[in-house]
């Protein structure tokens, strides 16, 4: 494994190799009941303009008041990103005009953000791990929403989102492929969900990304970057990067130059298109907001929040590998979702019984996860309980049933007896494994007698043993103990 080493990810152009340089600005909606500078609700899906205070609507004389919970959530996130927490930060006005920005400016943080540099360790694949640097995290207000599809002649504005707290998490340009960018956003979302600082729901706009892409020849300075705004799914982030990189390579190989600009990704057409020329900081005329004092707190405040942080994904993965002996891949899959990790741990320790951790992991990440995906639910929200899966694993370990029969029992739990006890189901339906060697020998003898040609083939080619095992299992309804079947067949066939 290339731990903490970023391999070069080159793509082929018509005139040689190119390297993609990627940085992401992720906008994460802060989990809080009220907005950043007002007491209005942050409820999603409310009637248009029903969650709007006078501050959000920029009524004259209305002054912003900082929401302490949003500050705490930003600090928690910074701690989760192993980042520098700045004890003094400043809110600035970012000036621009848009119909859904009633103040005519956005309250953000420019020169003095609440969180400084940090790092995220990302598993790109089972054999590749990279570090992505965090440049900064700052708090800012979200804008409202312009609606252009309600009328043929008019546009409408919904200010429910106006003033909702966002954390803008700015990465360093450390990613070199779409796969790395996708893995980074997935890991970042997992960290935020563990911390409880953002729900990470991209469908509702709680997490969206501005994607900065440039290309260069290997070893050359960074090229001119273009920013793709408001990409709202991990899949689209990858597609936008690959599409934009190809566009830039085509221009450069034809002798053109890249214009620094803001672009939009159209997933339907599979292309990016120009939105506007890319603004520089001076275009926004940043200056400290005169209505807000600098935000200051002491180290004791930070330490108090740090002491109450939950176990985070990297620490949980390390513990699963150490305490349960799980391979890195299995541990990584389990901890990618906090509820799934909790479900696994409850299952493996159910009733104080020590179960085979790897076997439990195989069931949770295999058949149980497959069922959860088929019904569009997380593992923890299906009707399959840790108690049921623990009992199923116990029955396999006790050799009461085989793995194949266990799958049949799971199907019964899914389709017929949702609240059933696997042990009761096995008893009631006569699914116990046949361990009587006499009965198994009788089945083996019958199959050998009926297939003399196959016997000769198996003796010449031992891999044919699998055919005989299958026939015995079929004759016993899948109930024969597989280990006993193998041993008896080998003895009878002389292989």
Swiss-Prot record:
Enzyme class, spelled out: ligase
Stored Pfam families: GatB_N, GatB_Yqey
Catalyzed reactions: L-glutamyl-tRNA(Gln) + L-glutamine + ATP + H2O = L-glutaminyl-tRNA(Gln) + L-glutamate + ADP + phosphate + H(+); L-aspartyl-tRNA(Asn) + L-glutamine + ATP + H2O = L-asparaginyl-tRNA(Asn) + L-glutamate + ADP + phosphate + 2 H(+)
One of the GO BP terms on file: translation
Family, similarity comment: Belongs to the GatB/GatE family. GatB subfamily.
Binding partners and assembly: Heterotrimer of A, B and C subunits.
Protein name: Aspartyl/glutamyl-tRNA(Asn/Gln) amidotransferase subunit B
Organism from which the protein derives: Beijerinckia indica subsp. indica (strain ATCC 9039 / DSM 1715 / NCIMB 8712)
Organism ancestry: Bacteria, Pseudomonadati, Pseudomonadota, Alphaproteobacteria, Hyphomicrobiales
Gene behind the chain: gatB
């Amino acid at each position: 494994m290339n731990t903490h080493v970023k391999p070069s990810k080159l793509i082929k152009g018509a005139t040689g190799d190119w390297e993609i340089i990627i940085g992401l600005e992720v906008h994460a909606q802060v989990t809080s009941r009220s907005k950043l500078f007002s007491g209005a609700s942050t409820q999603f899906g409310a009637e248009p303009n029903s969650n709007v205070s006078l501050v959000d609507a920029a009524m004259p004389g209305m002054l912003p008041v900082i929401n302490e919970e949003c500050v705490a959530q930003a600090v928690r996130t910074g701690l989760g990103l192993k980042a520098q927490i700045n004890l003094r930060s400043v809110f600035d006005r970012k000036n621009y005009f848009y119909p859904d920005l009633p103040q005519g400016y956005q309250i953000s943080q420019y020169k003095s953000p609440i969180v400084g540099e940090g790092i995220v360790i990302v598993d790109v694949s089972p054999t590749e791990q990279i570090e992505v640097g965090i440049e900064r995290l700052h708090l800012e207000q979200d804008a409202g929403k312009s609606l252009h599809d309600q009328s043929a002649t008019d546009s409408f504005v919904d200010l429910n989102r106006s003033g909702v707290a966002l954390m803008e998490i700015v990465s360093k340009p450390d990613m070199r492929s779409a796969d790395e960018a996708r893995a980074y956003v997935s890991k970042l979302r997992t960290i935020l969900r563990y911390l409880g600082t953002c729900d990470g729901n991209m469908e509702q706009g709680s997490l969206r990304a501005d994607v900065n892409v440039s290309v260069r020849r290997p070893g050359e300075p960074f090229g001119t970057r273009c920013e793709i705004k408001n990409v709202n799914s991990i899949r689209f982030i990858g597609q936008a990067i690959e599409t934009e990189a190809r566009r830039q390579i085509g221009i450069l190989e034809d002798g053109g130059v890249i214009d620094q600009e803001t672009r939009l990704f159209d997933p339907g057409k599979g292309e990016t298109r120009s939105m506007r020329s890319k603004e520089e900081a001076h275009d926004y005329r940043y200056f400290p907001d005169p209505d807000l004092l600098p935000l200051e707190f002491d180290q004791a405040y930070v330490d108090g929040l740090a002491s109450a942080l939950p176990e985070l994904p990297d620490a949980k993965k390390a513990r699963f590998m150490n305490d349960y002996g799980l391979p890195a891949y299995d541990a990584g899959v389990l901890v990618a979702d906090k509820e799934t990790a909790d479900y696994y741990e409850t299952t493996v320790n159910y009733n104080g019984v020590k179960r085979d951790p790897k076997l439990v992991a195989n069931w949770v990440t295999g058949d149980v996860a497959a069922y959860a995906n088929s019904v569009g639910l997380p593992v923890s929200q299906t009707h399959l309980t840790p108690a049921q899966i623990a009992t199923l694993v116990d029955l396999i370990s006790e050799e009461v049933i085989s793995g194949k029969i266990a799958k049949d029992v799971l199907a019964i739990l899914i389709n017929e007896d949702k609240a059933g006890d696997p042990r009761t189901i096995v008893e009631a339906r006569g699914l116990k494994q046949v361990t009587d060697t006499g009965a198994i020998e009788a089945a083996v003898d019958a199959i050998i007698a009926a297939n003399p040609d196959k016997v000769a083939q198996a003796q010449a080619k031992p891999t044919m043993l699998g055919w005989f095992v299958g026939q015995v299992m079929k004759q016993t309804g899948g109930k024969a103990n597989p280990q006993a079947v193998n041993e008896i067949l080998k003895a009878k066939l002389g292989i």
